[in-house]
């Protein structure tokens, strides 16, 4: 769908697991989280759907309503006005995460502050205006310690008790968050360098500039 060019809007409610079948791990489950089929903590990175979607030329946004309502509303408006495929990734708390859901807004704020769930908007229309299409709406310059956040969810506490290598998983998670933050910036720069060039007959010609 994202590569179709059709004017469709997609909303993904990301619970970071298979919540409708009992809380099994999925490709969306983050490093170190204890889920069914990963009791000792998932030992691989969370699939970054946002980064994949950015490569398709679609409008992409990642939101957390409890952390920043204004950013979420702006993302919905931009996605609706985008003439092409758009996708919004919304963090959706789940009982399987193991925290008091009535504290959802505060919890989402903490998740954003750690850099585990960065808020951003990627609008390809800005490329035609000569602007960077990627807007980071949350700062990770001075992030909340990831370890402090993990202590608030039992899905990580269970993994800590079951896996003697849990601290290593935490280190991998922090490194992965930082890596993906930088990679998104490079993808945005790549998109700007590879905008379609219109030929005299009106057809678009796309040149890919590879940096080796």
What are these regions (language model features)?
Residues 1-14:
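A short alpha/beta connector and helix-capping loop motif
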Residues 10, 60-62, 87, 119:
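Conserved beta-strand scaffold positions in the cores of enzyme catalytic domains, especially
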Residues 12, 64-65, 90-92:
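Active-site proximal loops enriched in glycine and acidic residues that flank catalytic Cys/His/Asp
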Residues 15-20, 95-97:
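Short gly/pro/ser/thr-enriched loop/turn and capping motifs at secondary-structure boundaries
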Residues 19-29:
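Glycine-rich, charge-decorated loop segments at or immediately adjacent to ligand/cofactor-binding or catalytic sites
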Residues 27-82, 151-156:
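Conserved thiamine diphosphate
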Residues 72-171, 184, 200-204, 209:
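Glycine/aspartate-rich loop-and-adjacent alpha/beta segment that forms the canonical ThDP
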Residues 174-196, 202:
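Short, amphipathic C-terminal "tail helix"
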């Amino acid at each position: 769908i994202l590569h179709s060019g059709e004017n469709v809007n997609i909303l993904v409610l990301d619970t970071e697991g298979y919540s409708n079948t009992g809380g099994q791990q999925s490709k969306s489950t983050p490093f170190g989280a204890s889920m069914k089929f990963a009791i000792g903590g998932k030992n691989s990175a969370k699939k970054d759907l946002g980064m994949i979607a950015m490569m398709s030329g679609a409008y992409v946004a990642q939101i957390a309503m409890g952390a920043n309502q204004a950013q979420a509303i702006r993302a919905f408006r931009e996605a609706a006005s985008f003439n092409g495929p758009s996708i919004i990734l919304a963090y959706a708390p789940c009982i399987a995460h193991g925290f008091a859901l009535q504290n959802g807004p505060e919890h989402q704020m903490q998740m954003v502050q750690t850099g585990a769930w960065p808020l951003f908007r990627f609008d390809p229309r800005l490329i035609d205006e000569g602007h960077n299409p990627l807007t980071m709406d949350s700062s990770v310059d001075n992030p909340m310690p990831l370890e402090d956040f993990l202590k608030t969810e039992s899905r990580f506490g269970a993994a800590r008790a079951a896996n003697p290598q849990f601290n290593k998983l935490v280190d991998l998670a922090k490194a992965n968050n930082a890596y993906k933050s930088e990679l998104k910036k490079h993808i945005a720069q790549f998109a700007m360098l590879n905008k379609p060039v219109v030929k005299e007959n009106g057809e678009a010609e796309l040149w890919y500039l590879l940096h080796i």
